Every structure is written in C-alpha cells, then in structure tokens.
UniProtKB/Swiss-Prot annotation:
Keywords assigned by UniProt, alphabetized: Cell inner membrane, Cell membrane, Membrane, Phosphotransferase system, Sugar transport, Transmembrane, Transmembrane helix, Transport
CC terms in the record's Gene Ontology section: plasma membrane; transmembrane transporter complex
Species annotation: Escherichia coli (strain K12)
Name recorded for this polypeptide: PTS system glucitol/sorbitol-specific EIIC component
Entry's induction text: Regulated by an unusual system which consists of the activator GutM and the repressor GutR in addition to the cAMP-CRP complex.
Domain named PTS EIIC type-5: residues: 1-187
Compartments it resides in: Cell inner membrane
TM segment ranges: 29-49, 68-88, 132-152
C-alpha cells in the first residue's frame, strides 16, 4: 500500500517537474526567438515605413499569385514560423483568411530546403528523409519536390479560401474591406 502511494506521489510530482522542464525549454528556446523576431520585424517596419509596407501588401493583395505565393514565401523565409503569419496584418480584411491559409502551410513546405523556417516541425520531413537515407537514396529530390508541391498547394489553399470567404460574405450579407486600414497609419 505504501509503495502504491509513494509511486503515485512520485508520478504526480514528476508531472510538474516535466512541466517545469518544458517551461524552461520554452523560456530559453522559443520565447527569446519569437521576441527577437518581433523586435526585428517591427524595426524593419519602422525603418522601411509602415505606409510603404501597406502599399506593398496592397499591391500583393491585388494579385492572387503574389498574395498566396510570393508574399508567404518571402515572409516565411525571412521571418520563419510563426512570424510570417503576422504579415497578414498588412492584408485587407477580405484576404486575411486566405493569406493565413497559404502562409501557415508554407511554414511546412519550405522546411526541407530551409530548416530554419520551422525547426519545431522538422520531424515530418526528417521522418520521410530517414526512410530515403536507409535506402541510400538522395535527399535533394525530396527537398525540392517538397518545396514545389508545397508552393502549388499554398497557392490553392489561398485561392480556395478566397472562394469560401466569398460564399460566407454572401451568406452573412457582409462585405469585407478590400483596402488596408491600420490604426495610426498615415495613408
């Protein structure tokens, strides 16, 4: 009986110890990275000028290829996951859901060639790569295929989300903004 209670108590405190390890890992790992990326992104926005970024986003928003292919790729390569998603704030309301759909997937599809983008989910690519390595097959074609299929998929995710957003706009009787309007922005 004492052994069962002791084992239960050790398990219970072990739960909190493991939680502490995870928290410490986040405090020393992902949180400083995210804070640094936020600082750099905001510094770049201030350096370049918010109005210029808004105009660039507005131009990208006018074209589905740039909206769901170009901007997510550049944002993902430069700002990594999850900061690329925050670039959506420069999109008009009408395209924010679609941008998110395309950009969130680009964080996965670019991982094979650029592992810095999403190191937390690199295990998906590495799992497939380990099978090829076991078979003594090259990894280059896998990484390139992963990227190219991902780019096409990113575009279609954004485009299909555009269509579903239009359906919901019509059903709900609303019209989402097609221009960028940020608080405190000088247009």
């Amino acid at each position: 009986m004492i052994e069962t209670i002791t084992h239960g108590a050790e398990w219970f405190i072990g739960l909190f110890q493991k939680g502490g390890e995870v928290f410490t890992g986040m405090v020393t790992g992902i949180l400083p990275l995210l804070i640094s990326l936020l600082v750099i992104m905001n510094a770049l926005i201030n350096f370049i000028g918010q109005h210029r970024i808004e105009r660039f986003a507005q131009r990208c928003a006018g074209n589905p290829v740039s909206r769901y292919l170009l901007l997510p790729c550049i944002g993902t390569f430069v700002f990594c996951n999850p900061m690329t998603l925050s670039l959506g704030r420069f999109m008009p309301e009408k395209y924010k859901p679609s941008y998110y759909a395309a950009a969130s997937y680009s964080c996965h599809s670019m991982n094979g060639l650029f592992p810095h983008i999403n190191p937390g989910e690199l295990f998906v690519y590495l799992g497939i790569a380990s099978g090829l390595t076991t078979l003594n097959l090259p990894l280059g074609p896998l990484a390139v295929s992963y990227l190219l299929v991902g780019l096409v998929t990113n575009f279609f995710r954004g485009w299909v989300t555009d269509l579903t957003t239009a359906i919901f706009e019509k059903k709900m009787g609303i019209q989402l903004e097609q221009k960028v309007h940020l608080a405190g922005a000088t247009s």
